[in-house]
Amino acid sequence: MAYAHRRLLHLFATALPLAAACGDDNGRDSASASATTLPSTTVPSTSDPTTATTTAGPTSTTDAPTEGTASASATDGGSTDGVSAGSSGGTSGGTTGPGTTGPMPCPEDQVVCDGNTAQVCDGMGGFKSETPCPKACAPGLGCVECEPGSAQCNGQVSQVCKEDGSGFVDTLECDPLQGMMCDPNNGLCTGACANLGGLSYIGCDYYPVVTQQLDFYVGPNNPYAVAVANTTADNATITVTKGGAPVLTDMVPANSVKAIPLPWVNELALGTGPSSVVPDGAYRLRSTQPVTVYQFNPLNADVTNDASLMLPVNTWTGNYVVAAWPFWNDFGGYPGWYSVTARYDNTKVTVQAAKGGTPTQAGAGVDGQGNGVVMLNEGDVLQVFSTFGGDGTGTFVAADKPVQVLGGHECTQVPFGITACDHLEESIFPFETLAREYIVVPPAQANGQAEKAVIVRIVAAEANTVLTFEPDQPVNKNLANVGDFVEIPTTTAKFVVKSDKKLLVAEYMVGQDAGYGTSDPAMVLAVPSEQFRTNYLFYAQPNWSANFVDIIAPAGANVMVDGAGVGNFTPIGATGFSLAHVALSNGGGGNHSVTADQKVGISVYGVLDYGSYWYPGGLDLALIPQ
């Protein structure tokens, strides 16, 4: 089906600073909602932008709308009572001038409304004509089918009147599986999931997706699973579907977390390539209350694990820069990969590898250098695999409708030559949410007495990127092209990286035989301080030898983990921030929380003998202007 949210795209392209500035501590933004935005070719429009939201990378001819930003708050185009904000009564529309005793005549041929009567001004204080309107009158338009910007319900679909008043167009699906309904009094979606208000990792609509894994770890003894954290005081009903077919229904109690195993999708998990599209490959998870979702591949503590923070649909865009890891040649070769999941039918996805190309397993419209165009339908998953000498890091993904992107590796050593290999995966943050400054810190070793080394990749999301480090790091500082990156080898350094352009920063935990304690490779994306939050609810599988939450907090912040104060912060240079490695109790069910009186950033990880996982514990996803 066609998709052209022109009004929404105009808002997105012109109001990024407002969207970034308006978020509160919960990432709330007055111009967003979680109700499903429906594709349409006739949404009211004041402009027809055709340029991409980013001009730094490979050119895209489509904006990347943040889904749901045409919200239930109806701040754009109409009031919440379904009456056009632009309508007015009266017979003139003029203004009182100097020396006059009444309103100035309206200009000749201007159309004004007197109630439901359209009047055409004669320029002399009278009217050329007066026409009773059978349905509605709109200033400047005259008789119309509906008042532009007004809303109504068509079943459980919220409709908005087009700008020319010619009729209503579907805009929002008030999804009952997200606890919503359409209110006939104002034509808008109601319910907890209709009023999220902001862009963050908290949402009601997610697409968990199985990723490439070693074949002999795919099976019922090592289940793929999602952990759902209910952030509200009400029970959340969870519905999982796949390709429109029901998979399961579950309930997550208020303010708690539940791990929910899901069947493996063998077409995505097994083998080592080639690049392909798996129709209906993704699960769709919907909740009647706002929740957060993490996926574990697999759930059980094992020697080839990782985990990903899932991003709700209302935060997806059409622009991403990929972080992955190079093809590993041992044991016949294991590929790095990235995946793209579509929310809507007929989604056009263009992928462009960094530096013009990288060795890639061709397939599904992607060539042997990692470039191509692929069409996806709702729930379809494109998986792109590297081959000998290839690395998908820096690939630019551009789509004409919102998509989800993950990156990682089937199983790899970090660095090469250091035992053992482990699965890598992480959700990639949209380009629009990336920042120019990141604090990079290493994780803790299992004993909590020392820190574990990482390899850090800093990827340019825009061309002509210049890096600075505090303290300095011995790497190239100039990145000429989108997707170029620098790699800081095995290090336990804590530092800040800054740029005048947007960056993506990925950290890779080194293998156990590197000599930094129990663990194996795992992958995480650094979260910029601009996207920090004051509260988090998350899950750490209690069967791991040790689980930690790392907290980056402003100096002097009061932070609680599971209700206990955190006091072991150490300053991170002269940044004004401090770091705490907090060991999590494995005595409960895996539910944990972080609260603070200032915004903080967290990452969560677990380690065992030759095994580990790592993911960002959460973040806001406010739109950060270029």
Question: Which residues fall in each region the model found?
Answer:
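Conserved functional hotspot residues at active sites or interaction interfaces
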Residues: 151, 190-235, 240-242, 247-394, ...
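Sec-dependent bacterial lipoprotein signal peptides
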Residues: 1-20
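Cysteine-rich, disulfide-bonded extracellular modules and peptides in secreted proteins
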Residues: 102-197
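Functionally engaged cysteine thiol sites
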Residues: 22, 32, 69, 73, ...
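Ser/Thr-rich, Pro/Gly/Ala-heavy low-complexity intrinsically disordered linkers and tails
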Residues: 19-106, 143
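Intrinsic-disorder/low-complexity regions
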Residues: 4, 23-28, 47, 62, ...
